Amino acid sequence: MDILDKLRGGVIMDVTNPEQAKIAENAGAVAVMALERIPADIRAAGGVSRMSDPKMIKEIIKAVKIPVMAKVRIGHFVEASILEAIGIDFIDESEVLSPADEVYHVDKNKFKVPFVCGARNLGEALRRIQEGAKMIRTKGEAGTGDVIQAVKHMRQIQSEMRQLTCLREDELYVAAKNFQVPYALVEYVHKHGKLPVPNFSAGGVATPADAALMVHLGADGVFVGSGIFKSGDPAKRAAAIVKAVKNYDNPAILAEVSENLGPAMVGINEEEIKVIMSERGV
């Protein structure tokens, strides 16, 4: 079983130290994202956000048996090479960090370690896959606790894929031109009705119900960032979100796991956001 098979259908959690990583692992997370500050703190602090300290990442790698991911800035292939050198399992070329390049993303085909990238629509998803991404995630709006953008992006991608399946084959060439990707990628979506890589949800997931909603909308799994360790009872909320993803279509179980979780993260309403991270890297 390769790493993508292990991750599919699961929850990936942001952690900032080995203790949090162990909480995530014990709760049933399929992987953890190692970073010095969770997105809510990155958003609050402002300034330039960069790759995390390799020493901290290595400590988290040692602490858990599940795969460990870490973020690099968009276009920063040197940060990516550093993470590959320390043995990271998966790299997230992330709009949550300050972009290093306004034009180019990392050429992910040159790396052995797999990459995940964010997308708001099918065009962005296919361009990242062309560059070598092995997983796509909705960008959402990280660090807000507001799921509305993740919902918007997932619905957009799913809608555009459904539209592609209805096109005549000769119309696919125009679609490929519009998406700025090779014909073969458009043809794959046309034939299969899905992306050639897993499509996870990220950005604003804060409750078991949020996580279940994203799976209903087509997510192959869920990233949860600030929603766990900014909440009142991280261990209980983490386990509840894992159970919600596995039982997304069972309202009785969802009701059970949603009880007595303590306060959710306070969050930021969409209208209050000053920095729109999801607009980075198209």
Curated annotation (Swiss-Prot):
Give the domain of life: Bacteria
Query: Active-site positions, per UniProt?
Result: K71
Recorded hits in SUPFAM superfamilies, A to Z, give: Ribulose-phoshate binding barrel
According to its UniProt entry, the protein's GO biological process terms are:
amino acid metabolic process; pyridoxal phosphate biosynthetic process; pyridoxine biosynthetic process
> What is the reaction catalyzed?
aldehydo-D-ribose 5-phosphate + D-glyceraldehyde 3-phosphate + L-glutamine = pyridoxal 5'-phosphate + L-glutamate + phosphate + 3 H2O + H(+)
Binding of D-glyceraldehyde 3-phosphate occurs at: R155
Q: Which residues does the annotation say bind D-ribose 5-phosphate? A: D14, G143, G204, G225, S226
The molecular function terms of the Gene Ontology recorded here are: pyridoxal 5'-phosphate synthase (glutamine hydrolysing) activity
Please name the pathway: Cofactor biosynthesis; pyridoxal 5'-phosphate biosynthesis
Q: Which family does it belong to?
A: Belongs to the PdxS/SNZ family.
Which NCBIfam families does the UniProt entry name for this protein? PRK04180.1, pyridoxal 5'-phosphate synthase lyase subunit PdxS
Functional note: Catalyzes the formation of pyridoxal 5'-phosphate from ribose 5-phosphate (RBP), glyceraldehyde 3-phosphate (G3P) and ammonia. The ammonia is provided by the PdxT subunit. Can also use ribulose 5-phosphate and dihydroxyacetone phosphate as substrates, resulting from enzyme-catalyzed isomerization of RBP and G3P, respectively.
This protein is called: Pyridoxal 5'-phosphate synthase subunit PdxS
